[in-house]
Every structure is written in structure tokens, then in C-alpha cells.
Amino acid sequence: AQGSKGAVSADGPEMPGRVQVNKAFIGFLTHTGFAHGGNGYEAAAFLIEQFKDTGLKAADDKNHGLDLDAMAMEYSNKYKAYKAEQKAIGNLEYAKVPCINHPIFKGKDVNFDPREEFVRKLFKGKGIGNVFLDYYHSIVNAMFKAKVSKNVYCVNIDAVIAVILLKM
């Protein structure tokens, strides 16, 4: 089979670059699970919960009027208390914030997933706003300020997938 599984149609073009967009999108949807790439599912649920009472009408509205840093700090303080409570009772399988941190892109004072960074710069260059992606960056900074983390985690590529799909 040419290309990635799920991205090549049954009548199959031999060049992956010729796969039709609709078939590539369906391939992505059918081959993304909860283990890898699927963390975006949890991210969408997380963001829906965070924004449910904000009155946000459109994710690309740059004049949304929300104080993302304050929202992120409030969440980070609640998360810090939750994490401490869970650790105190011996639960190390407590809920993690989806789509932040990465086993490869870590260990620096401020961490970046280069794939997410590329997309974020691309969005900025094209004038595309996404309040959800901006909120994710507020979250990783607030978690550091609230001493939930020892450094600024990266926002990983699964977050990008989630915020784009959620914006749709």
C-alpha cells in the first residue's frame, strides 16, 4: 500500500500526494484512537468544560473579551489542589491536563513542541485566531506560575488537532 493506512482510497492513487482531501480526512478520523492522537478527544472535552459558561460564540473571534490568563490561573490553582489531594491518598493515576507536556519536548525552562510551534506561527502569519490554542498557552504558563509544574510545559501537537477540530 502506498502512503499511510487509511489515507489511500480503494481505487488508490499511487502517489500519497494525490489522495483526495475528503478521503485523507476520513482516514485521519478512522485511524485516530484514544492512545495516540486521541488525547485530542480529551482535549476537546476539557476545552468544552473550560469555556461552557463563557458565552464564547466563535473560536476565531479575536475580540472575545475573555481574560484567558485569569481563567488559566483559576483552573491551575484548582488543579494544584486536586493533584495534591490525589497524591495524598496515594492515587498517582489522577487526571492529567490533556495535550500538554511531551516525553521528547521537555527538560528546558520553557518547552515547545516544534510541530505546534510551526502551526501557531503559521496561524499568526495568516491572521488566523484560535482562542482555544491561546488558552492552552495560558494554561502551561499559569501551571508554572501556580507551581503545578517545575517548568513551562509545551503545548503538544494533539492540542493543535483538537483546537482545529473543535473550532469547526
Give the predicted meaning of each segment.
Residues 1-168:
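Hydrophobic alpha-helical bundle cores within soluble ligand-binding/oligomerization subdomains
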